[in-house]
């Protein structure tokens, strides 16, 4: 089946999706969760093929980690689907209601976007998370994953579609594009007749290609060149603990810290402590001249390092003399995802919060919290780094649009 034919099928589901109620959606989601757990052996076997091919093709440790599914991760996916089922239905909410002098009653309500296309890379959990969120928000979804995860994604999509069929829910609300060539992605980018929105999830190259070439409206989920600034008033032990978590807890995710910015007044004392903590996970530290001088574990960085989302056990260090310099450096090198300041100075914290132009800004906490579940949104479709429609973790509410309902009694203009 071509991508265009899948688009037609997805469009044909909208009559059903516009009338489905919360109970039906939740029944379908719980059926998906149960079916995933019941078929964990099948999923793991399919995933093993992808992992073997990935190793043979030289995928990095970070990408293999993103790709890997085991019983624990499958259970987590199933539990995530159940959590989405437990969330309030985002559709049909009355955002405003007022009566005009002419007697017209006007209501503004939330409605599904329609058909959403998602192009992503080697993360099979996206297949399940995205499908669950789209279904709960009343949207149909066409999923196009990377070739690295095709066997895993095929198994997951077939299982989810079977679950929908079992409870009488239209199964074409979830479709997977099995053609992993660039042509299928290119086709989706121009399916304005069938897709209402396109969401890319992956590295800079994928996101850039979709944003620059798509005629379908795009919600951009940016890469994560996340920074932590260590202020001159920082608690050094707290800073080391937060940085260790933000960098090493899971290197392959977009909210991992990739770059440190350290005030020169504290660098000689702070950087050796931070570096020794990072050494526990063999993190390579690349820094400027002052960072290299401050700590023997630091090697020289290039200009390119400060723009790089490593997704690996590597971190860059930039030395600054002032908070203003730190803010300027971060805003000019960040991807607009997540940044943090470690400080005991309230005025500096407030200035950082106001001046940093990213979707999520932290004071004395790890950037790893930028996540739909951690924010109480349930699973997420991605982290939006743009400013229109959605910004930050995209949960159910961000997958809705609005509609005006106008009630009259014979009024004419």
Where are these regions (language model features)?
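A structural signal for short, well-ordered beta-strand elements
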Residues: 18-19, 232, 319, 342
């Amino acid at each position: 089946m071509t991508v265009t034919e899948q688009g037609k099928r997805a469009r044909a589901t909208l009559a059903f999706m516009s009338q489905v109620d919360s109970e039906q959606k939740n029944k379908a989601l719980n059926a998906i969760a149960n079916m995933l757990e019941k078929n964990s052996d099948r999923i793991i076997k399919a995933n093993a093929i992808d992992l073997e091919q990935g190793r043979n093709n030289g995928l990095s440790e970070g990408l293999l980690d993103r790709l890997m599914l085991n019983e624990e991760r499958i259970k987590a996916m199933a539990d995530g689907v159940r959590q989405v089922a437990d969330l309030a239905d985002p559709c049909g909410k009355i955002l405003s209601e007022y009566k005009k002098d002419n007697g017209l009653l006007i209501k503004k309500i939330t409605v599904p976007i329609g058909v959403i296309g998602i192009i992503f890379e080697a993360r099979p959990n996206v297949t399940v998370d995205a499908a669950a969120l789209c279904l709960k928000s009343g949207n149909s979804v066409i999923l196009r994953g990377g070739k690295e995860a095709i066997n895993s994604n095929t198994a997951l999509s077939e299982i989810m579609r079977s679950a929908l069929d079992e409870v009488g829910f239209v199964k074409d609300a979830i479709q997977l594009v099995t053609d992993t060539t660039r042509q299928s992605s290119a086709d989706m980018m121009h399916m304005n007749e069938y897709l209402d929105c396109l969401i890319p999830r992956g590295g800079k190259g994928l996101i850039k290609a979709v944003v620059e070439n798509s005629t379908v409206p795009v919600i951009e989920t940016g890469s994560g060149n996340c920074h932590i600034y260590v202020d001159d008033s920082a608690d050094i032990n707290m800073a080391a603990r937060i940085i260790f978590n933000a960098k090493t807890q899971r290197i392959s995710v977009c909210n991992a810290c990739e770059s440190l910015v350290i005030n020169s007044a504290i660098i000689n004392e702070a950087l050796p402590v931070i570096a020794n903590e990072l050494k526990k996970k063999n993190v390579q530290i690349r820094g400027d001249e002052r960072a290299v001088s401050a700590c023997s574990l630091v090697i020289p960085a290039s200009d390119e390092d400060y723009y790089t989302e490593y997704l690996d056990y590597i971190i860059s260090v930039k030395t600054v003399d002032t908070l203003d310099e730190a803010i300027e450096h971060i805003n000019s090198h960040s991807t607009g995802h997540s940044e943090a300041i470690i400080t005991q100075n309230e005025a500096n914290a407030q200035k950082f919060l106001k001046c940093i132009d990213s979707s999520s800004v932290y004071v004395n906490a790890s950037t790893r919290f930028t996540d739909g579940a951690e924010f109480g949104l349930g699973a997420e479709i991605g982290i939006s780094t743009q400013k229109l429609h959605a910004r930050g973790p995209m949960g159910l509410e961000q997958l809705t649009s609005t509609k005006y309902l106008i009630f009259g009694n014979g009024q004419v203009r």
